[in-house]
Amino acid sequence: MDPNTPSAQPISFTASDGYLLRGFCWRHPDADARRPVVIINPATSVRCRYYARFAAFLHRHGFDVLSYDYRGIGESRPARMRHFEAGWIDWGRLDFEAALQYAFAQFPGQPVQVVAHSVGGFLIGLAESSHRVSRVFSMGAQYAYWRDYAPARRAGLLFKWHVVMPALTAVFGYFPGGRLGWLEDTPKGVVHDWTARHPRFEDIWRSGGARVLPDAERDELVRRFAAVRADTLAVSVSDDEFGTTSAIQRLLGYYRSSPRTHLHLRPDAIGQTAIGHFAFFHSRFEHDLWKIPLEWLRHGRLPPAPKGEVVALRAEAPGEPIPKPA
């Protein structure tokens, strides 16, 4: 573990299908039912260790924190990756659900909150118990619909992630991202889900795909998103080629019962040259950007005078029809 996070302890817990998941926990010695426990949902194929300094930061400010790796990644990697079966749906329905159950059992009565990066914000809605989450902070949260990629980078991203990545996956039985320096090695099911070209996420698992779910099961997934009522802050940055404003809004549309706030930042407005999709969780932002999630998780509000564009979306009434994202 990172030497600057001495309070982190290794943990393990089992998903409902028996798969063993591993991660780390930053826990205060005294129990306090008022203290929130924060679960960190990583981005696709990013190890939970990447968020260690951020987790330690939250711990120093009074939170209990749990980070973990999805099956196939980092601490939860199997002995053999070739043809290992795992997709986004497993990461959400099984792995994040298991993390929730671990938090409920280990921190009884404490509010459960989530910090989610990229696809981690999408996975929240797939879990059966996600309606019990009280607050969410997400950074660049989306599910990689290709038309939402930044226009200036779209062609290059399509070639890299929608042509080269699946081609290599077909050869190796998984995506060997580690040896290429393209994130971690990634299960083939996750590659399929990432490269599916559907504007609505539930259509990833329609007939003709690598994994097919019955219509009723896919409809149930959409209802799970609508059942989430967590106060949600979704942050996007102008130089994020994946988490564009359209991508963020597309995902937020599914969390229709949650009060949602979208904060869009420009690096130059906060004295930075770049932030992109990954740098938000770098420790150099501890004294500026990290104040945003800290204030949200503590009080459910933005810091005074945030240097960005703010869009608030109301929670919709239960009887309203589920909107169809464009």
Regions found by a protein language model. Give the residues of each.
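N-terminal cap/lid segment of alpha/beta-hydrolase-fold proteins
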Residues: 1-30
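Active-site glycine-rich loops that stabilize anionic/oxyanionic intermediates
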Residues: 35, 40-46
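Conserved alpha/beta-hydrolase
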Residues: 48-80
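Alpha/beta-hydrolase active-site loop
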Residues: 85-106
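Short beta-strand/loop motif that positions the catalytic acidic residue
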Residues: 228, 234-236
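Catalytic active-site module of serine/aspartate enzymes centered on a nucleophile-bearing elbow/loop
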Residues: 261-326
